[in-house]
């Protein structure tokens, strides 16, 4: 949580202390529903992690070709997401089928597929765009306006928690027939 604390306790306050060229102070909303966070590659997993750990600070996430298989603990997110009560987050994932691959870590694209599957299973409002490119920003740049429209749809309505399939009762029904 050091990264998100740095953002909230140091970076944003420092930015708010600055003035625009015409002398006005910057004013950032403290309402998490008014905030989004985005990143690409390792920044994509950082953006997701910041919102995951602090949904009281960020509610909208754009992860472009997020390195969920390469960063420590990132490969654990799909299982953690499935086992944790849903949080009020809206998440957009982007990646390309030709993203990076490493014999020790696996395929970055597969990591994003697992994230999308876990988020959908757990009731999150999640969308994705899978392109054919590699570990670069070409596809992400092309879809960025649509991503922003999707992340901010319905604003100022609050982003809400979804209902996880864990909570749908299927497991209880399944156990009752055993």
Give residue ranges: language-model regions.
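Non-catalytic cap/lid and distal C-terminal segments of serine-dependent acyl enzymes
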Residues: 1-178
């Amino acid at each position: 949580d050091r990264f998100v604390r740095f953002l909230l306790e140091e970076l944003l306050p420092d930015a708010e202390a600055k003035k625009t060229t015409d002398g006005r102070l910057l004013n950032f909303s403290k309402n998490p529903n008014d905030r989004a966070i985005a990143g690409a590659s390792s920044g994509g997993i950082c953006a997701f992690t910041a919102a995951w750990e602090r949904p009281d600070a960020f509610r909208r996430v754009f992860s472009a070709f997020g390195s969920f298989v390469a960063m420590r603990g990132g490969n654990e997110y799909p299982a953690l997401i499935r086992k944790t009560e849903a949080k009020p987050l809206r998440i957009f994932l982007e990646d390309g089928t030709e993203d990076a691959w490493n014999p020790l870590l696996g395929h970055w694209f597969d990591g994003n597929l697992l994230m999308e599957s876990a988020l959908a299973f757990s009731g999150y409002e999640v969308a994705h765009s899978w392109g054919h490119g590699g570990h670069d920003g070409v596809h992400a740049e092309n879809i960025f306006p649509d991503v922003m429209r999707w992340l901010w749809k319905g604003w100022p309505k609050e982003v809400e928690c979804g209902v996880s399939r864990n909570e749908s009762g299927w497991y209880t029904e399944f156990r009752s027939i055993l």
